[in-house]
Amino acid sequence: MSDITKEQVVEFIAGMTVLELSEFIKELEEKFGVSAAAPVAAMAAAPAEAAAPAEEEKTEFDVILKSPGANKIAVIKVVRALTGLGLKEAKEKVDGTPSTLKEAVSKDDAEEAAKQLKEAGAEVEVK
């Protein structure tokens, strides 16, 4: 095995676009015969009693771009910074509103993302 460290692999993956990362995950699934969606299926099969306490405080939030507002270019820049998408992908997200920009993030991260988008002139919803 070569002298590549785990940190170098993590840094390389962190520099990938969402599209590149998606393709990378598909290749890994094919190579090793696994599915990244398997844990989700296991959670869906859990007993309904475990999901009963619906009054629990929500810990994961989604940031949804409702409208880019008047300053679309500034919103695209913020979307790129928040998501790591390329220019084309970020523009498609902004043009295709409403669109989910971040999923299952902490409350602080969701509020910070919403704040940045609102400052750029976008209409944002945090669910």
Swiss-Prot record:
It comes from the Bacteria. InterPro entries: Ribosomal_bL12, Ribosomal_bL12_C, Ribosomal_bL12_C/ClpS-like, Ribosomal_bL12_oligo, Ribosomal_bL12_oligo_N_sf. Residues 96-127 are annotated as: Disordered. GO terms for cellular component: cytosolic large ribosomal subunit. Keywords: Ribonucleoprotein, Ribosomal protein. GO terms for biological process: translation. Residues 104-127 have a biased composition (Basic and acidic residues). The keyword Ribosomal protein applies. GO terms for molecular function: mRNA binding; structural constituent of ribosome. Homodimer. Part of the ribosomal stalk of the 50S ribosomal subunit. Forms a multimeric L10(L12)X complex, where L10 forms an elongated spine to which 2 to 4 L12 dimers bind in a sequential fashion. Binds GTP-bound translation factors. Forms part of the ribosomal stalk which helps the ribosome interact with GTP-bound translation factors. Is thus essential for accurate translation. Belongs to the bacterial ribosomal protein bL12 family. This is Large ribosomal subunit protein bL12. It comes from Oleidesulfovibrio alaskensis (strain ATCC BAA-1058 / DSM 17464 / G20) (Desulfovibrio alaskensis).
